[in-house]
Amino acid sequence: MTDAPLILLAAGGTGGHLFPAEALGVVLIRRGYRVRLVTDHRATRYSGLFTAEMTDVVPSETVRGRTPWALAKTALKLGSGALLAFNLIGRLKPAAVVGFGGYPTLPPLLAATWRRVPTLIHEQNAVMGRANRFLAPRVDAIATGFPGHEIAWPVLASKITNTGNPIRPAVADAATVAYDPPAAGGSLRVLVFGGSQGARVMADIVPPALEKLDPALLRRLVLTQQVRDEDMGRVRAVYDRLQLNCELAPFFTDLPQRLASSQLVVSRSGAGTVAELAAIGRPGILVPLPGALDQDQFANAGVLTAAGGALRIVQPDFTPDRLAAEITALAADPAKLTQMAAAARQIGRLDAAERLADVVGRVAKV
């Protein structure tokens, strides 16, 4: 196996970047490649395919300000990371380097281009992020999670392949579970989460929204909610007072299974979340993260909403009254929930990791 070609996967240290890298890694290993992960220190929070022996941490930095000092600090950190990555790539001699977005991918991808190692980036979002925009003219190929990038970037169109967003094996397994619409008067299983890092807005809005539900509907509710540690006390106090059937945790390691068992999902709209909702086929109420320069989550939610699989509510409109009204309307219309689930499933890409592995093979020429 030591003679097998090595593919270096570079990803920012959050679930949104690491999970598709993991999904690709599983397929590449099955095809006979070796894989290693290059990332930042945050990745240690996420267990999965990449053990410590398969992981290299390279210094990196996100642009956090526009002052000369802030920019100089960022440039220095990225420069030191690129030098370390240059030496790492010289030692490992990978057949290709694949980037999954985020500033931590800049050092290894730039180092790979300097070493003339074949390069590929994967853009998970419906709009291209800043790190990938910087790398796009410099790499050999671009894979995308959503269609339309070739229209937005015609000068790059010849490099672009729409593969879809790779999903983890656990998500593919969950996708075999058929949607089970709520029966009249029966339980309504609702899953609420805010992405791999949680979201305070769910703790702020969901509890007062549930307080506004009709008591008969509240008794039907079976709630699973991701709640950050710092929000747990106040959220649990409301639900205890409501005598709500609920399970709360800061992070769910079995989220794909929980998605599969849910009948309605309320969440942010990161690329991974949208891809998993579509793959498994579950109706969603999506609340894009506001304030992002690229408005990527707004665009991601728009893809699923346009297909009929979700409702998109921008955060200023995501009020307790609005959420209570949407839950009430959907709970009363199981046929609508079933239609949304089917529409979401229609645009799901279960073979995205295989398609991306095909592109990697073409770029690496091994």
UniProtKB/Swiss-Prot annotation:
Presence of the UniProt keyword Acetylation in the record: no
Residues that bind UDP-N-acetyl-alpha-D-glucosamine: T14, G15, G16, N125, R168, S196, Q297
Catalyzed reactions per annotation: di-trans,octa-cis-undecaprenyl diphospho-N-acetyl-alpha-D-muramoyl-L-alanyl-D-glutamyl-meso-2,6-diaminopimeloyl-D-alanyl-D-alanine + UDP-N-acetyl-alpha-D-glucosamine = di-trans,octa-cis-undecaprenyl diphospho-[N-acetyl-alpha-D-glucosaminyl-(1->4)]-N-acetyl-alpha-D-muramoyl-L-alanyl-D-glutamyl-meso-2,6-diaminopimeloyl-D-alanyl-D-alanine + UDP + H(+)
Keywords for this protein: Cell cycle, Cell division, Cell inner membrane, Cell membrane, Cell shape, Cell wall biogenesis/degradation, Glycosyltransferase, Membrane, Peptidoglycan synthesis, Transferase
Pfam family membership, one: Glyco_tran_28_C
Pathway: Cell wall biogenesis; peptidoglycan biosynthesis
A GO cellular-component term linked to this record: plasma membrane
Family statement drawn from the similarity comment of this UniProt entry: Belongs to the glycosyltransferase 28 family. MurG subfamily.
Function: Cell wall formation. Catalyzes the transfer of a GlcNAc subunit on undecaprenyl-pyrophosphoryl-MurNAc-pentapeptide (lipid intermediate I) to form undecaprenyl-pyrophosphoryl-MurNAc-(pentapeptide)GlcNAc (lipid intermediate II).
Protein name: UDP-N-acetylglucosamine--N-acetylmuramyl-(pentapeptide) pyrophosphoryl-undecaprenol N-acetylglucosamine transferase
The encoding gene: murG
